[in-house]
């Protein structure tokens, strides 16, 4: 037996699963988001109605009509996306402000429910005017809306949208109204339930309840809380039945979208409507069963015989179908009514097995059940009778046929053969049955209803109406009637413009003559200031325009206005005609609506009217929120300053380009004459007249949004192909306002002789210009260097000269794409019109250039050669061609081979269009090489630089070279200096090497390569394999030229080294410098010694070296080796030297860097010069830096000398950076916390903590008494009385202090460092032994260059250089200065925020020299301590948060021991300092360095900006080892003073510490240490504790402290600029990221530790979500400063 079907195929299974997953992901990505809260039944209804669309439920709002509104929103999106700029009928008031594409809205005066809708309409924006006119009965304020209704308005528009607003109009009325508007298309959303076709009654379906009384129908959907739809029955019936309107205003009605019984109808004006039958309800889930007995009626003398009064019942289609199948197949003896009733009762119960619904069921009333049983029984009885009769009559017929003789059979056989339409079988006889008989059935199935009725428009003549009624009467009788009246062809709108929102002019020829406004007018910018504000222009442009005045010469001729604007030394021309295209800075298009008879202009949201008056030209500007009049006096204005005009034009250009980059849709492209002209802001037909070739339109006003995607093919070498002449523009444009000069002919070469196998030039198909303009939906996937492009989309959107059809061998209409070609261009398949054949391909020019290409049929045979030939045969043409993937449809050619064949056989500029499946394949297999796009602006600027360069002696080789717009593929190998990039190139890989200098050229030639400098290489790079060494330093115009001319290009270089220098200072080099992305990075250098690597590691973080030289940099020694200088003057002064720029790429054994004073600006502006100079040697480099230029950029001997002086060694250590990762959203409980109101959150926080709004901004506490030291005061203690803050709330939850106040600085100095120090002279051995529990004996510590690098890296990250690091000279005050400044950070507190009496916080920063001296040692000691820490002990923040949280979670049975040090810094004394020095001795630090540290700490001077304090012993918060020694002292105190049982976790950071244990007690020696040092310890022992911004909950983990973080936000000043707010918002986002998986746990735990309600924490998280989303509200407050300072008592020690 065969068993292959039982063999499991893992590959196929995996592919199927991946395809299913991809389909599911695609469905979810394009799902409909359902925002309202819904019941379970409503969700099931929506899922059934919206099939097959995927739904995503995100409940966040309550709607009165949730089901209808979801459907409405979906259909609205479809209508608005298709209609573009349009006229809207009956818009909902709340949608006005959200849809700026609507040019006009037609309303009716409000009545009934409409009044309530207008009261809830927005009171701002365009809706405000509409609301005011609707509620007050006022006329419309502008042309954007009216209250005349759709049928009473005549605003011209080509496209319309009606969303559920045409139920009270018939199709004929709509056709007439569309004709009045000149409308050709109307998208109408209508609710058309099938029950309106039935008699009056009450119909309940699974979705809605419908009540039908004969005239009106009321529909209420499941879950509606207010009245539903209420419409006229006759209109709904006509909308369901009608597919076309005939008469003087013909229409075609097409159903383009349907969701349930909600339809989108596309009404299109068509001269000859054709029959378009349609099935409106193919997915109906109900069948309507008729009851024999109708409802009770009114009393009457005689019983009624009207059959239309009977009642119908909605029955699920599956119930009726199953019931009929069961009854029709029952045995004759088993068929009875009771059996039908039993079966119906069984299938009416809903049965669910697990998650599978086995039987959907039906919840029906008794009346409906009775009607269904009756109808089903009678229908089945009738069918059974027919079955019996048919079998009986058929048997008798068979008996007669079998008894026929030979002659009769022969006679029948001959006549059957002669018949053309042969259908087997025979009808025996006609069964008498009519539609209204009982035998016709009792049910109506909407799934099989077909309608194709026409409605005549009401404007037909009486004769036409009479004949129409006669025809309809004859049809009602069942007779065919040929109407002799043809539909009258009426106007269907302006056909001259293919613009969806074109507003034609309704001009009455009988109106008065047009007023003439010709003349010269003075237009000052000050008169148009309100308009500038409405245009939302920047303040700079408004200010510059206000200082300018223009002279405008207006000429009006034949409904057209020409303006000549004189602005300074510039002249602009504009031409105003109706329908002119206005330039925009985005994809959206605007056309000018100009009515000369009405003296009006309009486009987009702006309109104006003008009139000649005695004072001059009076213009009224109208827009949203703007109604401004301006009068321009006749005459000539004084000439504005050329400098002001140029600055205005440049600023305006920058604004246009910035708006172009940021806008998705775009707005007007503002020209100077458009803002300083009488008809602002319009400037159609803009021309800037300028005789200077370096200014004007070509350089300043260059837009990237063009009318067409013109493909320009780059110049190709003459290879025997047919030359391509210049092709006229293929974009259909409106008639220009002014005659345009003829285009210059393209200097293309003469056609050469055709290649073998190609047709002669005379036989080549020559393409005429093609006009094409349509909406683009294609998507660019890739662009090749030759200009060819790959698109995803429809082939017919292309603007190429030729279209390629996937044809068959006979070139007859077929299926697939060939059928689409036949539908659009049927004449192209006429073989008589073929102008040329090439192999199997046929060329035709009728009705447009088309190539019928024939691919092989892979169903029969795989033939790659024929596939190549199919593409090759389409290249015998002039112009570009748009291709499909030949053969991938019906012929089943794989996508890959067909695509490869096109790549090898196409011409430059061709286009390939892929369907979605092939597009996905291409995106998964697209070329991986990076590409450089050369835009028109870059090409133009590069060519200008080449022209300037070719005029010099060096650049003569570049004469005639051009850079063309396009895309270039390249390979870029980047690497650190000396990484061997050049050595990796072999002669077999390259034809030409381009290098920037002669030295490099000679070096390459010595290796056997053909190397050239950039200018001379222009003769040899065409079509060659090119390697460009030191590519970033090449002049960018030459780099672009060689990259574009080369067949393949491989770039070598270092992006961090010297870029190309603009020696001419023309500004062209930085304008076209390309942004090159390295394809590979090499990080290992074979040249640079170790110390050089450490100095440049800031630019190369991953640099490594193979050099064994450890120290190579020396200062102050005699010059050796090659001299390197920075300027040409220094080169002249030092014979034999080369500049750093010339030495780039070279390698020397020894070098001497000579920095002269004239190189200061160069080195400060380009640190790359210093990097190049430092990386040229392999053994030794002597630096002669008399002016100290290299020191200013962080390269000095002070850092290195101090490092080695302190005992540093060259070597490698473990880096101090701790790897951290972002937690995955594996639970993502944060998603359950939506953004909430910040006001309510902060008010609730204030209530829970007992804080109230503070009447002051800060508090200056009383200054403590100075107990030790000497304080120097300024003569004046000036203070500001108030503070301006930009805050989230006026309730602050932090201790309030004033860091910028001078008195606050004094209070902090004295309070922290002026307190008397309690000295304690004792041995450190006991404390060190106790500390060994956490930090064992450290031993000798090695300080390496790794710590030196980390020090330099930290300085660079802070924006510092090495200039502040000095030689270690203690006589120099700058070496030992300690700077004090007030800290702008206040502590969060749950207690008193004002009357706390505590001084502020400050930082005492040591000098950069001391930081560089001690910093590497302290980093090395810290690394040693981290390596010795026991398990469960955490130091500082040198650990991953997840590891700490896991350790806390593991300590389930522990309590939290917390210690709060008070006055931690000020209580440190000689004993703590001695312990630090003892540990330094233990680590092997030099004794002189330890004694220096002890000296600095024991007696010091803190230097504030205007104050200073001389003091003793205190700990400094800004010294290099602050965190290290504070943490060590904290550990020593805790472990010496307390004993812990079952210690699980201990964490120390500065003065903050926690220990997780089961019990603790104070150790015997604790009292001596606490009393001797004057320590102030506050211990707390509780189940949950706080530590370093997190909540420590044993068994649960370390959770973010939401309350503390939110409280600290209240103290932050979010101003004055947006940068500060952005920083804080990023901090909030980072904090929320920590809450991703533990948000709900935080609510429970944080609320317990602070004793607040969980709702508060929940509300605070929502508030933080709102802040992170940028939805925070800020309040600017000006509050006074409370001064509580008293006199400062000084006492000299």
UniProtKB/Swiss-Prot annotation:
Any one GO BP annotation for this protein: symbiont-mediated suppression of host cytoplasmic pattern recognition receptor signaling pathway via inhibition of IRF3 activity
Renumbered residue ranges of the record's region NTPase/helicase: 960-1204
Listed Pro residues bias regions: 738-752
CDD domains per the UniProt record, alphabetical: Hepeviridae_RdRp, Macro_X_Nsp3-like
Record PTM: ORF1 polyprotein does not seem to be processed into distinct enzymatic domains by a viral protease belonging to ORF1, but could be processed by a host serine protease like thrombin.
Any Pfam family: Viral_helicase1
Family: Belongs to the hepevirus non-structural polyprotein family.
Protein's recorded name: Non-structural polyprotein pORF1
Biological source species: Hepatitis E virus genotype 1 (isolate Human/China/HeBei/1987) (HEV)
